[in-house]
Every structure is written in structure tokens, then in C-alpha cells.
A protein has these predicted regions:
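Beta1/beta-strand and adjacent pyrophosphate-binding region of the FAD-binding site
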Residues: 14-26
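Core beta-strand elements of the Rossmann-like FAD/NAD(P) dinucleotide-binding domain
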Residues: 16-18, 222-233
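Glycine-rich FAD pyrophosphate-binding loop
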Residues: 37-57
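Dinucleotide-binding Rossmann-like beta1-alpha1 core, especially the glycine-rich loop
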Residues: 61-155, 284, 422-434, 551-552
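Flavin (FAD/FMN) cofactor-binding and adjacent substrate-gating region
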Residues: 107-190, 195, 205-210, 215, ...
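Rossmann-like nucleotide/phosphate-binding core characteristic of flavoprotein oxidoreductases
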Residues: 153, 162, 394, 398, ...
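Flavin (primarily FAD) binding-site architecture
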Residues: 236-250
Length: 622
């Protein structure tokens, strides 16, 4: 599967000299690329998967100060609150307030002494939040409010009634995928080249050991040759993979990778967030996010496969135990899936995982005899811009560039103009308006450009996904402009298939759009479909038990066999051979279906209103 959309085509970068090559397409890599590109540097980003595929897309989705860091990492709290304020100014369309209720649980006991201890516990909690209030203005946060037991239960009747009272806390939620993507888009619009699904196969070195570039290979194009990219500075921002990447160049540094697991619910449990505590004292959150709710995160040292971290049933039970203590009715809600990330936490010996610093550092490997290579470690989503500024300033200094950083003031794509959701929706049928309002949240002022396609083809206003309202115009525009190469890439940019259906309703139609826009073959389309279904099951597996697990496994089999994906694989391969390499999986009314021929006795699956059809596409594939 080849690249498309300029910024993903490695042929445009082959043999080209850059000022800086950034390895890693997470929030740190995208932030560094944006900062360097806006200073006029020629930048290339190399990411072996998709943007935000790792920890950057697997966090709690908040740009917060981190109240728990007040006890042992005050500088991180202040820095995160400061950068949160900048992010709010440069990307207001991506943000939403999350009002938190922090319950103070009543300890076991009775008598006068216990009454005194209860009062001390309440007073101590309020003093703690008064300290956090000092930093709230930096991120436009509201000061805390102390609630009585009755006031807290009136706000959220689902709370455990065994509370002394509660304290409120104001935080900001964000779509982390969009934050990464919009940093990357801005970098591209300032001249950067972004190569997703490209893997570094080696470092290019001079006779003095200086790093002068990297060799990369396209992971999606069969038979792709290795391409050489050159630059005097290479930044290793590959997160938890960082030490492994540095070792390829003969350099080294240490991290303490931390595994974080979240549980996702497809519906809102409450409109408030809650601070919850694990049995071991770890603080987590139960909070509304987008159209659903999430609970997490765990924090455990991780020694496993960085490419395939998995949530376990024990981790799910640990999270639910903590949630149940504050919100006893949690078991009444159906869990949708889990997601997992591995943090590139700074290495420290003899500290519990949740006490590790969330500070960031970057290392110059010249002292190890590997000049030209800089490695980035640590950091938080809320402080990514500060990290990027520090690294980019060092890169610019080495290259003699004196242009100042502008990322704290320059708006991200979508924040440049007014957002007139009501105006955009007035000419659309009511059933499509929710999708447009959600589009405005993801794309801001640039939604207007996406909606121009609806003027030419009103059918593009139709929703392709009902769980997470997404219209066809957004899907096509995303493929054309946002470094999309695979079906799962669309998921990260639009949240399509992140809802309750997990892609069951929308994956086939979306894959057809990807085929049309990205010039896929039918076999590639089917590979994308199966990959999306596999990813869906991996996320759902840890939250399923007993009969639910058996039912889901049956659903997987029915989706693959009943939906004709198995026979369609064989049909597509044969038809592609007959049609010079091109065939398509089409969806439409049976009367509109293109002509087909039988392969293995099964060509298409018909329902009452639709048909899935494999058909050759005339002409050679470009």
C-alpha cells in the first residue's frame, strides 16, 4: 500500500537533505516538528506506525496540572498548568471542561475521637486543594469548593453515601489524537515532510562517528527499497522505544517504562469526574470524555513487548475495585473496551511507579561518541509544548538559527478563524447536524472547508458512523489532508468506530471510502478491514467474562464468515488477478450493484437493502 497526500510519500524525501530529522510521531515528536518548522528549519518526521499510535493516544485525555504531583513534584504541576494555558489559547476548539468531585470517604470507626479525625480529614483535604488553587489561574481553572455530604450527593446521587463531604476540582479534557495530528499538520504546512508507517533500519554516520541521517523503509509498500535521509541533527523522540532507537546508533540512556490501562464506557456514567483510589493508594480518575466515560490509569513497571502491550483481566478488576468504592453502581454499566499505553518515564531507582517524576529531559549523546543525536525522555501531554520548545531551541542553536519560538501564540490548524456551527448546519437535514457539531470540535474553523464537499455532493453529509457521529465529508477530507494511510488511522483522527459498535456498523463503508481516496486494491481493503476487527477484539477481550466472551468470539466469527470476509479474500485475489491488479469491495442497493462473477460459489452478501459486492475495476492501477 503506497503513500498518498504529499507528506506521506517517502519518494519526496529520498536523497533529500534536511536540517533535522525527528524520529517519532507522538505528541513530543509532532510538537518538536512544528516548532522547528515554524522557525524555518527543514524538517522530516519518521514514525514507524501512525501519529499518536503509542502513549500519546493512550492517556487520560486531560491537559491538567496533576494534583497528585503537588506532594513530590511541584515543578511539574506548575509547568503543566502553564503549558495548559498556552494549549487552551492555541487550540480552544479541542478543549472541554471536566468538573471533578473529589469525595472524602468516611473511615471506619465511631466515637468522639473518630469525629475529630473526620474533621481533620476534611480540613486536610481542603488545605491540599487550596495549594492547587495557586496554579489554577495559569490554566483558567476555577478554584475549589468544599461540599457537604448532602451537597455532593445532590450533585451526583450515584456517589457512595458513606462520605464525609467532597471538594470540587476544575480540569480540562482534550482529544489527544487531534492535538498530535494538528501539530503535525501545522508542521507540514510550514514545509515539513511526515512519513508514517516508515521504520528506521539504521543510522547514517560519518567517519568521525557523527550521526548524519537515517535509513528508512516503508512498512506498507511491498518490496519497498530502503531510502536514505540526511540531516546534521537527528532527534530521537520515540518514547518508550527511545533506548532501543538510541542503541541502533551506538548510544544509550535509561527509562522506566510505565504501563497504563484505561477502561472505556460507550455512554456517560456521570457528567462529573471523580478522583478514585486504588487498593494500593494509586490515584485514578472516573470521568466523562467525549460521548462516553473512561476510568484509569494504572501505573506499573513494564518489561514486556512495547509493540503489543495488552490489558489483563486483573488490571480491569483492580480499576473496578477502586471505582466501586466511590461509585457503587459502576457494575450496572457495560464496559466497551480497554486501551493501553507505555509511558517513557524518567529512570529512578527505589521509587514506587506512581511516585516517579513526570519531568522531561533530553540527552546529547556526543559524550558517548555519537554527536548529532539528541534523545528525549519523560514528559506529560500537558507540557509537550514546553518540551518541544526546549529541544527545538537547542536544535536551532546548533544550526545557527536565531528565530524565536512561536508555538505558544500561533494557533493550531482549526483555531485560526471563527467557528459558526449554527451557520454551517442551517442548510443540512436535522439528522446530520450532530455529525457537523462533532466535526467542528475536531476540526474547528477548518470544518467549513470539509463541508464544501457537501455542496457538490449532498450524500457526503450522511453519517458513516452512528455511535461517534462522523459524516462522509469528514472521512474523505481527513484522508486527503491528514496523513492517513490505513483504516485505523481514520479512527484516530475522527473517533469513528470508537463507540459502542467498535466499527461493526461503519468499518466496511469507511474502508470503501479509503479504497476510493487512497487507490487501494481489494486485497488491501480486506486486510485493513480484518486489521480493524482484530484491534477491536484486542481492546474488548479484557472486559469480557463467561458468556459475554463466548458471545463476542461468536460475533467475531460471524462478522468474518457471515459477512463473507473469508470468501471475499479469495474472491478479491482472483478478481484482482483478472483485472490487472484492481478490484473493489462495494456497498450499495442490490439493483445498483456492479456486474460480478462467482468465485468459490460466493461473491456477495445481500441484506434487505444493501449488498457487499466484489467487482473488478477496469484499467491498470497507476
Amino acid at each position: 500500500m503506497g503513500g498518498h497526500g504529499g507528506s506521506t510519500d517517502s519518494s519526496t524525501a529520498s536523497g533529500t537533505d534536511f536540517d533535522v530529522i525527528v524520529l517519532g510521531g507522538g505528541i513530543n515528536g509532532a510538537g518538536i516538528a512544528r516548532d522547528c518548522a515554524r522557525r524555518g528549519l527543514k524538517v522530516c518526521v519518521v514514525e514507524k506506525n501512525d501519529l499518536a499510535k503509542g502513549a500519546s493516544g493512550a492517556n487520560t485525555g486531560m491537559i491538567h496540572g496533576g494534583i497528585r504531583y503537588l506532594m513530590y513534584d511541584v515543578h511539574t504541576t506548575k509547568m503543566s498548568c502553564t503549558d495548559s494555558g498556552y494549549i487552551q489559547r492555541i487550540a480552544p476548539h479541542l478543549l472541554f471542561r471536566v468538573p471533578f468531585i473529589v469525595p472524602v470517604m468516611k473511615p471506619q470507626g465511631a466515637g468522639l475521637l473518630q469525629t475529630m479525625m473526620d474533621r481533620l480529614l476534611l480540613e486536610g483535604s481542603e488545605v491540599f486543594f487550596e495549594a492547587y488553587d495557586v496554579y489554577q489561574p495559569l490554566k483558567r481553572g476555577k478554584p475549589h469548593t468544599r461540599l457537604t455530604r448532602d451537597e455532593a450527593l445532590a450533585l451526583e446521587p450515584g456517589l457512595n453515601p458513606n462520605i464525609l463531604g467532597a471538594v470540587t476540582m476544575d480540569e480540562w479534557g482534550i482529544d489527544p489524537f487531534r492535538l498530535v495530528v494538528e501539530n503535525a499538520i501545522d508542521a507540514v504546512e510550514h514545509g515539513a515532510v511526515i512519513l508514517t508507517w516508515h521504520e528506521v533500519t539504521g543510522f547514517v554516520k560519518g567517519s568521525d562517528g557523527r550521526v548524519e541521517g537515517v535509513d528508512v523503509q516503508d512498512r506498507l509498500t511491498a518490496g519497498a527499497t530502503t531510502r536514505r535521509l540526511r540531516a546534521p541533527v537527528v532527534v530521537n523522540a520515540t518514547g518508550a522505544w527511545g533506548p532501543r532507537t538510541a542503541a541502533m546508533a551506538g548510544a544509550s540512556y535509561q527509562l522506566r517504562p510505565g504501563k497504563g490501562v484505561h477502561i472505556v464506557y460507550s455512554h456517560r456514567i456521570s457528567n462529573y469526574g471523580f478522583a478514585i483510589t486504588g487498593v494500593d493508594g494509586r490515584q485514578m480518575f472516573l470521568m466523562p470524555h467525549e460521548n462516553g466515560s473512561i476510568i484509569g490509569t494504572t501505573d506499573d513497571d513494564y518489561y514486556g513487548d512495547l509493540d503489543h502491550p495488552r490489558a489483563t483481566e486483573d488490571e480491569v478488576k483492580y480499576i473496578l475495585q477502586a471505582a466501586r468504592d466511590v461509585f457503587p453502581g459502576i457494575d450496572q454499566y457495560r464496559m466497551s473496551r480497554t486501551y493501553v499505553g507505555v509511558r517513557p518515564t524518567l529512570f529512578t531507582w527505589a521509587k514506587n511507579e506512581d511516585r516517579l517524576s513526570r519531568e522531561h529531559e533530553f540527552y546529547d549523546h556526543e559524550a558517548q561518541g555519537v554527536p548529532g543525536l539528541i534523545s528525549v525522555a519523560g514528559g506529560k501531554l500537558a507540557a509537550y509544548r514546553q518540551l518541544a520548545e526546549e529541544v527545538s531551541t537547542e536544535v536551532a542553536r546548533r544550526l545557527g538559527n536565531t528565530v524565536a519560538c512561536s508555538t505558544h501564540a500561533a494557533p493550531l490548524p482549526g483555531a485560526e478563524g471563527p467557528i459558526d456551527v449554527d451557520g454551517w448546519m442551517k442548510d443540512l437535514p436535522k439528522r446530520h447536524r450532530l455529525a457537523v457539531s462533532r466535526m467542528a470540535y475536531r476540526h474547528g474553523s477548518r470544518s467549513q472547508a470539509l463541508l464544501k464537499a457537501v455542496d457538490d455532493d449532498p450524500r457526503q453529509a450522511c453519517e458513516t458512523c452512528l455511535c461517534e457521529p462522523v459524516c462522509e465529508a469528514e472521512i474523505r477530507g481527513t484522508i486527503q489532508t491528514e496523513v492517513v494511510r490505513r483504516l485505523v488511522d481514520i479512527r484516530r483522527r475522527t473517533r469513528q468506530s470508537m463507540g459502542a459498535c467498535g466499527g461493526t456498523r461503519c468499518a466496511v463503508r469507511t474502508s470503501q471510502i479509503l479504497l476510493e481516496e487512497a487507490n487501494l486494491t481489494a486485497v488491501e481493503q480486506l486486510v485493513e478491514l480484518q486489521g480493524a476487527m482484530d484491534a477491536r477484539f484486542i481492546g474488548k477481550r479484557p472486559v469480557l467474562e463467561g458468556a459475554n466472551l463466548a458471545t463476542e468470539e461468536l460475533n467475531q466469527a460471524m462478522h468474518f464468515l457471515g459477512g463473507n470476509l473469508g470468501p471475499l479474500f479469495r474472491a478479491a485475489r482472483l478478481l484482482a488477478d483478472d483485472a490487472g491488479g484492481r478490484a473493489a469491495i462495494g456497498i450499495g442497493a442490490p439493483a445498483d450493484a456492479p456486474a460480478t462473477r462467482d468465485v468459490d460459489g460466493i461473491v456477495h452478501h445481500r441484506t434487505q437493502a444493501t449488498a457487499i459486492v466484489v467487482a473488478p475495476i477496469p484499467g491498470d492501477r497507476p
